[in-house]
């Protein structure tokens, strides 16, 4: 599992899979910094009430859960 701190610090550049399951209440906008590489995004177990309208910016994303 990855941490929000790693994401915000830019330490996850180039990854293809991101696991931010559990403990989020808002969608981290920093995820868009990974748009060139991110294929799998795990947001399960979070208290997200919605996803951003511009989620389509993650053009390589194939799996979202």
Please give the residue ranges for each predicted region.
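The feature captures the LRR N-terminal capping module
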Residues: 1-45, 49-65
């Amino acid at each position: 599992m990855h941490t929000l701190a790693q994401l915000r610090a830019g330490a996850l550049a180039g990854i293809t899979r991101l696991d931010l399951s559990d403990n989020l209440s808002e969608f981290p906008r920093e995820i868009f910094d990974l748009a060139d590489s991110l294929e799998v995004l795990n947001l399960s177990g979070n208290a997200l009430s919605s996803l951003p309208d511009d989620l389509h910016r993650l053009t390589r994303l194939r799996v979202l859960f």
